[in-house]
């Protein structure tokens, strides 16, 4: 799944750590070996870009 994660990261314009692959669809994702297939999986919702983590500013504001 390394290749799929790398392709998805480049398509979603984010890092590999931000890419979430659906654990229930591992067989489907592992068959995808092109950018076109990755694009289809993103559209279907099997591959998602994780949201940004927001760091609390409460300690800075004190």
UniProtKB/Swiss-Prot annotation:
It holds the Pfam family Ribosomal_L19e. It comes from the Eukaryota. Keywords: Ribonucleoprotein, Ribosomal protein. GO terms for molecular function: RNA binding; structural constituent of ribosome. The keyword Ribosomal protein applies. GO terms for cellular component: cytosolic large ribosomal subunit. GO terms for biological process: translation. Belongs to the eukaryotic ribosomal protein eL19 family. This is Large ribosomal subunit protein eL19. It comes from Zea mays. The gene is RPL19.
């Amino acid at each position: 799944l390394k290749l799929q994660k790398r392709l998805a990261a480049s398509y979603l314009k984010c890092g590999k750590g931000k890419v979430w692959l659906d654990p229930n669809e591992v067989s489907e994702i592992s068959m995808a070996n092109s950018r076109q297939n990755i694009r289809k999986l993103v559209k279907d919702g099997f591959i998602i870009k994780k949201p940004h983590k927001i760091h609390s500013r409460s300690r800075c504001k004190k």
